[in-house]
């Protein structure tokens, strides 16, 4: 069983601490249809469907806070017309249901702030802490303070598993990933990035500079809330030089501190599929 509480069968989780109930979702990529339109594929906006799913989830969970773990919008360097049209209304609607909304910025969110109500709080790409959980999007290094949490929660890669039948037909399914994490090795990488120093004893440096005792032992990767997106099949075999590091995006997954081969995979309904290494023969 997972020590976090995914809301089955949604790609969302609920974190609780006393009277606080934080609903966490990630990777909405609102306005993603604009990219298809530019390629000559015209489909209706899917934002109303995503909004309806989120409203049903809010009604079910009754959160006191809603935390978005990055990539609200889809266009990276600009704001598309569809985003100007859809995103303000999206947040005004959910803000009426949940007054406390926070967003950890993702790599697609550089021009997001002008589209948001003033009541929405923007958090840095380095993430945030809630109880014993450190949450960050995953395209950038987490803040050193997050290393004082036992569990890290990230998103960004839209994790999926791929299956091929005997005829060669391929299908994919969204999954949750639960992996063990070498906290000291991760701390060494984070400190090298944040301070430029290679620490012989990262635990001591964390305590001295950030008053943090490194505790990280697990990392969870959330599936994308937007079910229409593609994903990264984590069980596909890759060949060639540095194949393992190229299989993942984001500095933490490439740091060597996360044991992906033995990571557990779960479908959205909670079904345990096996470890990543066990599933590679099906990819």
Functional labels for PLM-detected ranges:
Residues 1-283:
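Extended recognition/assembly regions associated with phosphoester-bond processing machinery
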């Amino acid at each position: 069983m997972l020590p976090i509480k995914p809301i089955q069968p949604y790609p969302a989780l609920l974190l609780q601490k006393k009277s606080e109930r934080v609903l966490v979702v990630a990777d909405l990529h609102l306005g993603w249809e604009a990219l298809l339109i530019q390629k000559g594929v015209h489909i209706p906006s899917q934002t109303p469907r995503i909004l309806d799913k989120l409203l049903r989830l809010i009604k079910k969970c009754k959160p006191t806070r809603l935390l978005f773990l990055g990539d609200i919008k889809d266009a990276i360097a600009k704001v598309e017309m569809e985003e100007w049209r859809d995103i303000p209304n999206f947040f005004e609607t959910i803000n009426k249901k949940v007054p406390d909304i926070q967003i950890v910025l993702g790599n697609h969110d550089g021009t997001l702030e002008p589209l948001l109500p003033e009541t929405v709080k923007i958090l840095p790409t380095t993430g945030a802490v809630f109880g014993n959980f450190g949450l960050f999007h995953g395209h950038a290094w987490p803040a050193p303070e997050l290393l004082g949490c036992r569990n890290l929660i990230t998103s960004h890669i839209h994790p999926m598993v791929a299956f091929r039948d005997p005829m060669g037909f391929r299908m994919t399914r969204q999954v949750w990933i639960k992996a063990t994490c070498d906290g000291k090795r991760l701390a060494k990488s984070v400190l090298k990035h944040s301070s430029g120093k290679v620490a012989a004893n990262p635990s001591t440096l964390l305590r001295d500079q950030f008053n943090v005792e490194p505790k990280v032992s697990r990392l969870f990767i959330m599936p994308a809330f937007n079910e229409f997106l593609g994903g990264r099949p984590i069980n596909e075999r890759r060949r060639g030089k540095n194949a393992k590091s190229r299989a993942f995006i984001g500095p933490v997954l490439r740091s060597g501190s996360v044991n992906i081969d033995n990571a557990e995979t779960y479908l959205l309904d909670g079904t345990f599929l096996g470890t990543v290494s066990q599933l590679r023969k099906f990819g």
